[in-house]
Swiss-Prot record:
The keyword Nucleotide-binding does not apply. It comes from Aliivibrio fischeri (strain ATCC 700601 / ES114) (Vibrio fischeri). Its EC number is 3.1.11.6. This is Exodeoxyribonuclease 7 small subunit. It is an enzyme of class 3 (hydrolase).
């Protein structure tokens, strides 16, 4: 089975795979070359996930701007 490009995965699938990659890297059982490949894949998955979140945030802002009565507050992306 071919590995999908991160940008072609759903957000949920990318996060699930990223979680798996992190677990494999944290185990410390991978040979160096395999660990580097997993790390590269993890970076790609994280970037794709961040891009999907950014796109979703922009869509929400556009939808809220369409409602003239809605109060817009900037999204800071940080938990309290």
């Amino acid at each position: 089975m071919a590995v999908k490009k991160p940008e072609n995965l759903s957000f949920e699938a990318a996060i699930e795979e990223l979680d798996s990659v992190v677990n494999q890297l944290e185990s410390g059982d991978l040979p160096l070359e395999d660990a580097l490949k997993k790390f590269e894949r993890g970076i790609s998955l994280a970037r794709a996930g961040q891009e999907k979140l950014t796109q979703a945030e922009q869509r929400v802002e556009i939808l809220l701007q369409a409602d003239d009565n809605a109060e817009l507050t900037p999204f800071d992306g940080q938990d309290d």
